[in-house]
């Protein structure tokens, strides 16, 4: 998945800065998956990182719909605790404008809006073609800026890109690719650090990094699975038992 998106965004030079979005309806897939407790956002780093792309788009069009996931809700069910409402409110304050919160792709307004948690939508996780087509059809330009979830074959991070009339990489995504290309240049000693909770979603990335890195360090929940596979005690820590023999 990552290789195909990289080919689309880099080799074909489909960058946001080189894409005509003047007065176009733009869908922006970002990764604003931040910790929220009692409606309060505990970390604003990912929100701040998304601002340059959002501001770049708003300079050329008001027709922007921001799409993100948040947590791991049960697909097809609304969960107020995993609503993007607090995130929308944060951007309203930063941008000093009212932002509408939507729950479907049927009536996208001609002004900035936020789509509700994309993982509430049936078919997102399994890259359902109908959902992918629905997302792709409603926008003139679809911008992928969710680098941290680019490895997922979900409807909003993969299917919609393939089916979009005009898809491109956002500013953050392009910067991450440039940094990776620089890091992976020949004759460099590379230490790769991989975190996260699930080995299953990072396995191919880890395999690729092993061939390109001097050393690979795993942390977070991923490390627990490696430790248990090596026979080390991990107590009640998060682990993927189905990946122990991989």
Locate the predicted segments by residue.
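Active-site loop-to-helix "anion-binding N-cap" substructures in soluble metabolic enzymes
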Residues: 11-246
């Amino acid at each position: 998945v990552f290789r195909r998106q990289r080919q689309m965004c880099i080799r074909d030079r489909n960058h946001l800065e080189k894409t005509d979005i003047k007065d176009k309806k733009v869908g922006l897939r970002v990764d604003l998956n931040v910790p929220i407790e009692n409606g309060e956002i505990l970390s604003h780093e990912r929100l701040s990182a998304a601002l340059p792309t959002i501001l770049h788009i708003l300079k050329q069009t008001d027709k922007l719909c921001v799409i993100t996931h948040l947590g791991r809700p049960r697909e097809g069910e609304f969960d107020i605790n995993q609503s993007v409402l607090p995130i929308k409110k944060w951007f309203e304050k930063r941008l000093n404008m009212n932002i509408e919160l939507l729950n479907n792709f049927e009536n996208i307004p001609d002004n900035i809006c936020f789509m509700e948690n994309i993982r509430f939508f049936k078919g997102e996780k399994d890259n359902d073609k109908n959902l992918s087509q629905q997302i792709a059809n409603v926008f003139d330009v679809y911008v992928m800026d969710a680098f941290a979830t680019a490895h997922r074959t979900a409807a909003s991070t993969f299917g919609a890109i393939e089916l979009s009339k005009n898809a491109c990489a956002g500013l953050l995504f392009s910067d991450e690719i440039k940094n990776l290309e620089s890091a992976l240049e020949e004759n460099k000693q590379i230490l790769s650090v991989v975190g996260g909770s699930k080995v299953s979603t990072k396995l191919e990335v880890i395999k690729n990094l092993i061939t390109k890195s001097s050393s690979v360090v795993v942390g977070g929940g991923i490390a627990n699975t490696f430790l248990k596979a090596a026979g080390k005690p991990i107590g009640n820590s998060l682990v993927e038992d189905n990946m122990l023999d991989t």
